């Protein structure tokens, strides 16, 4: 298992539906499988409003793992722990050589100004 920390800025959070963020770059010959995500929201003055959930995906949030609620709507510092459930089988889709990305599932969050620390634990499987 591997761990990585990624901090999302306010501008990245506000564009998370239109511009998903790469958490782990693609690795040739490897399949990346997320296991756990710890979210740490660093509130500044205004909470975000979201129109949907967040999702981690392989190359795209449309091919993703379980969607989850983001802690960025809290009026103070907040934390959340998410584990992932997945059962994907897609004909003609290649799982390896794809990055792990995070995005908002329906609309961009609005209104907030804090940052979000993401601590991702994932498997790196050689195929």
Label for each model-derived stretch:
Residues 1-13, 105-127:
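C-terminal interaction-tip segments
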Residues 14-64, 116-125:
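Beta-rich globular "head" domains
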Residues 49-90:
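Terminal beta-strand-rich extracellular "head" domains
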Residues 19-23, 85-87, 104:
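Short structured motifs
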Residues 37, 90-112, 117:
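Noncatalytic modules at the cell exterior or secretory-pathway interfaces
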């Amino acid at each position: 298992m591997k761990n990585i920390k990624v901090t999302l800025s306010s501008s990245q959070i506000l564009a998370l539906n239109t511009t998903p963020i790469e958490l782990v770059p693609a690795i040739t010959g490897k399949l990346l499988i997320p296991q756990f995500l710890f979210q740490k929201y660093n509130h500044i003055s205004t909470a975000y409003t979201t129109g949907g959930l967040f999702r981690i995906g392989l190359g795209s949030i449309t091919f993703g793992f379980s969607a989850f609620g983001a802690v960025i709507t809290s009026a103070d510092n907040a934390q959340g722990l998410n584990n992932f459930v997945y059962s994907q089988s897609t004909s003609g889709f290649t799982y390896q050589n794809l990055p792990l990305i995070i995005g908002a599932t329906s609309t961009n969050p609005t209104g907030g100004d804090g940052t979000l620390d993401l601590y991702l634990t994932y498997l790196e499987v050689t195929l």
